[in-house]
């Protein structure tokens, strides 16, 4: 089987027989995460746009053809439900806590959409959440099974860790074990954000007694997933002024338990939420937005906003239930080209998420 690292793997078998010299590139483009091999549709399109690239002209060509780095979406977020069981400090208040008060994406539309995603992108990670919690979606297992029919698609479940039935977790983990793929069949992110019930109460705006119960339930859920599917669970803490003092104990605790942790930067959603950032992590020089380059967000009614920051869909690119995905994707190209020219208007001018990167 062909391996993209076969040259290094071959040299490594007898590395002392080779004279290796490390060369530092005059222009650093590592942040662009370029991969010039054709193992996916996105990479093929990228290679096709740079057939004349060399070690001498790479910086000039990439700068001149930065528009070509936006190929097809690699990350989709399907809003199966708008409901979320907690009113966390980092969540817009416009999302309801009860599923009966929230819109649901029709299962038939979701499954049809998944088939079209597989045709358009071929390889992608599909998150089953935008701001809602997929545990509240009645047909979750059916949607996951539909996604895993396609070998190029993976599932990401972002959840509070509350309200999960053991049988559902067991079924999903069994589906994952039967559908091995890269980077994972099903990945899990659990929003914990605290190690103490007092901090959990503050971050998720619940009473102390509720916090004790919820934190215990979410912790047990995380450990259940880890026990059945090790290596694909990420406990997450949103780093904010409010919970900064628990960042280190959170990291140490969960690193020891499951081996991996996500420390997520706080997103004020372009000023919609108060600024609770502990520090400004943005690069010294701004570059085009990763999310405009590789993400597509789809709301329960099929509307496609410009990005996740477009909470109220005031910059809609189209409707995924009614229009071709390629056509919708092309409509985002103009805003991306503005970023290439260092023009950041409207939401983009207030955004602090452009340098963050999804799976």
Curated annotation (Swiss-Prot):
Pfam families named among the record's database cross-references: SPASM (PF13186)
UniProt xrefs under InterPro entries: 4Fe4S-binding_SPASM_dom (IPR023885), Aldolase_TIM (IPR013785), Radical_SAM_PqqE_MftC-like (IPR050377), Spiro_SPASM (IPR027608)
- The transmembrane segments are none
Q: Which CDD domains does the UniProt record give?
A: SPASM
Q: Would you say which domain of life the source belongs to? A: Bacteria
Q: Spell out the protein name for this chain.
A: Uncharacterized protein TP_0285
The organism is: Treponema pallidum (strain Nichols)
């Amino acid at each position: 089987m062909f391996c993209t690292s076969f040259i290094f793997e071959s040299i490594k078998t007898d590395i002392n027989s080779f004279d290796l010299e490390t060369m530092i590139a005059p222009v650093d483009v590592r942040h662009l995460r370029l991969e010039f091999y054709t193992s996916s549709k996105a990479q093929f399109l990228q290679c096709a746009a740079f057939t004349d690239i060399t070690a001498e002209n790479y910086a000039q060509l990439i700068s001149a053809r930065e528009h070509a780095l936006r190929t097809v979406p690699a990350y989709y977020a399907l809003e199966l439900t708008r409901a979320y069981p907690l009113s966390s400090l980092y969540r817009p208040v416009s999302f309801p806590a009860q599923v009966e008060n929230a819109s649901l994406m029709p299962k038939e539309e979701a499954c049809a959409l998944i088939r079209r995603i597989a045709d358009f992108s071929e390889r992608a990670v599909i998150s089953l959440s935008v701001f809602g919690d997929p545990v509240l979606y009645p047909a979750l297992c059916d949607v996951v099974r539909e996604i895993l029919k396609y070998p190029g698609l993976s599932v990401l479940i972002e959840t509070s860790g509350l309200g999960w039935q053991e049988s559902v977790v067991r079924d999903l983990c069994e589906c994952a074990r039967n559908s091995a793929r890269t980077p994972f069949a099903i990945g899990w992110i659990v929003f914990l954000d605290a190690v103490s019930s007092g901090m959990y109460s503050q971050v998720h705006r619940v009473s102390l007694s509720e916090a004790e119960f919820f934190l215990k339930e979410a912790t047990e859920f995380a450990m259940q997933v880890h026990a059945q599917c090790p290596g694909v669970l990420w406990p997450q803490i949103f780093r904010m002024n409010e919970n900064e003092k628990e960042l280190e104990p959170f990291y140490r605790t969960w690193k020891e338990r499951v081996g991996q942790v996500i420390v997520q930067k706080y997103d004020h959603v372009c000023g919609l939420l108060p600024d609770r950032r502990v520090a400004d992590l943005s690069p010294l020089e701004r570059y085009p937005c990763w999310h405009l380059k590789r993400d597509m967000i789809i709301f329960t009614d099929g509307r496609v906003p410009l990005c996740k920051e477009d909470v109220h869909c005031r910059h809609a690119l189209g409707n995924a239930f009614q229009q071709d995905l390629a056509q919708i994707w092309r409509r985002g190209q103009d805003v991306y080209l503005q970023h290439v020219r260092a023009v950041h208007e409207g939401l983009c001018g207030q955004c602090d998420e452009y340098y963050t990167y999804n799976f």
